[in-house]
Amino acid sequence: MDSDSHSDSQIKEFYQLKNIAVVGVSKNDEKPSHQVPKYLIEHGYNIIPVNPTLTEVLGRKAYPSITDIPDKIDIVDVFRRSEDIPAVLDDALKRKKDEIKVFWMQSGIYNQEAERKAKENGIDVVYNRCMMEEHRRLFADEE
């Protein structure tokens, strides 16, 4: 599976956004869906966990859906199967217009229809990339 066509400088720009809703976050510390948000917290990002089966994870309140989050969201980072992506995007699109800047599908995740719909709504789309791996790769010299 290919990745999106964003340049490194574009991806670096996305990391200036600090409020990240992580959909599909896990309390299992062996899963990437736990390790990635933990890493992002350690690097100064405001992680907002989204998982309907959790009330708290990583020391933060978890929300059942993106639509339940009262705070601002800049990026939606998704750890769900590709076929679940359209429903996640639909929830994201229920937020205030122009609030969400980036819809990020983690490594191995892609849905063409969701990509098209997000772009039509002015949201940048990143897919088949890990937020932790990309951060490490792009900012390694700054750590």
Regions inferred by a protein language model and the residue ranges of each:
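Conserved beta-strand elements of the Class I
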Residues: A21-V23
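ADP-ribose/adenylate-binding Rossmann-like module
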Residues: R95-A118
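Active-site capping/gating segments
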Residues: G122-E143
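NAD(P)-binding Rossmann-fold cofactor-contacting core
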Residues: S26-K31, P37-L58
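Phosphate-coordination loops involved in phosphoryl transfer and adenosine-cofactor binding
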Residues: Q16-N19, I100
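Short, acidic/turn-prone active-site loops that include or flank metal/cofactor-
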Residues: P52-L54, S107-Y110, R129-E134
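Short, charged, surface-exposed secondary-structure boundary motifs
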Residues: V57-R60, D74, E113, E134-D141
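Glycine-rich, highly charged phosphate/nucleotide-binding loops
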Residues: M1-H6, V57-D71, V78-L89
